[in-house]
Each structure stands twice: as structure tokens, then as C-alpha cells.
């Protein structure tokens, strides 16, 4: 299984982080460009690969945490006083949405390497000394999905999934 995972992850090398979307608190990172057209004729980028994150994660450089998963629950304006009506679900109202957009628009970062660990974690190294670390933090042995990498390059999508019970591919 390790060889299969390494082969899949090696296909990410050289792809840029091009887009991010969100479904609730699940971040969806897009690498490369793969265009699809919906039933209304609108064209959009699904990425050659999409990484759906359902575990804690963070982007770092050598000096700081650039953005982390829990920034979703912080207001976009870091200097404003707490707003009891703050709605993290509103797009771009939270710090995570704003900082991820800034990371993508102000940097062209491409993948240099990607590795998994025995606990379901994932580390992706980008150029410019930027790193994405996904670190599952559940001790539960119940079926919990940590992250999913989806390959959109072909008609049939392939998935690499990290679960509390191990890795799965199709």
C-alpha cells in the first residue's frame, strides 16, 4: 500500500496550488487546472487534484503559521473587537478564507514533495519554504475520514483517502 500511496503523491509534484473552496468547515484545495462545465454551461476549475481536509491543518513557512484550519472561527479583521453576530460560515467573513485567498493570489507555490505518516497525517512541501501539514488528532477508532485526495485528470475520478482505520484507494 505504501508504494501505491507514494506513486499517487508523486503525481502532485510540480502542480501549483490554484484555488480553494469550502463546504462548511471542510477546506477543498485545488492543485493544477482541470476545467469542467456544469449543466448551466458555466466553466470552473476543479483542479487536476483536489484535497478535501477534514482534520486540523496549517500552512507554515520558516517563521510563522500562515493560516490554519481553526482560523475559520476568527473574524477576518484581526484588529476588530469581537462581534457576537460573527458568522464564520459567510464566505470571506473569517480569517481562514481571507488568508488562504491571500496565499494563493500573492504566491505561486508549486508542490516539491508529499508524504504521509502512519497516523493518517499528510505533509506537502511547496517552493518558497511553504509547508502544508495535516495532522489528525482523534484517538477514536471509529470510522473518521481525515482527508481525501481526488484525481480529476480523467473521466473517472480516483481517490486516496486517509481514515482513522488506515488508507484506502480506488
Describe each PLM feature range.
Residues 1-170:
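Surface-exposed, interaction-prone regions used to assemble/regulate multi-protein complexes
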Amino acid at each position: 500500500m505504501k508504494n501505491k500511496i507514494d506513486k499517487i503523491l508523486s503525481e502532485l509534484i510540480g502542480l501549483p496550488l490554484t484555488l480553494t473552496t469550502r463546504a462548511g468547515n471542510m477546506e477543498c484545495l485545488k492543485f493544477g487546472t482541470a476545467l469542467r462545465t456544469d449543466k448551466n454551461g458555466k466553466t470552473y476549475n476543479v483542479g487536476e487534484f483536489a484535497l478535501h481536509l477534514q482534520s486540523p491543518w496549517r500552512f507554515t513557512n520558516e517563521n510563522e503559521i500562515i493560516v490554519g484550519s481553526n482560523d475559520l472561527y476568527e473574524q477576518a479583521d484581526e484588529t476588530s473587537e469581537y462581534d457576537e453576530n460573527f458568522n464564520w460560515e459567510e464566505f470571506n467573513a473569517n480569517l481562514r478564507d481571507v488568508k488562504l485567498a491571500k496565499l494563493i493570489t500573492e504566491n505561486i507555490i508549486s508542490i516539491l514533495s508529499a508524504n504521509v505518516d502512519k497516523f493518517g497525517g499528510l505533509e506537502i512541501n511547496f517552493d518558497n519554504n511553504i509547508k502544508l501539514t495535516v495532522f489528525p488528532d482523534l484517538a477514536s477508532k471509529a470510522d473518521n475520514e481525515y482527508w481525501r485526495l481526488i484525481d480529476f485528470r480523467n473521466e473517472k475520478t480516483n481517490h486516496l483517502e486517509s481514515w482513522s482505520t488506515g488508507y484506502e484507494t480506488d
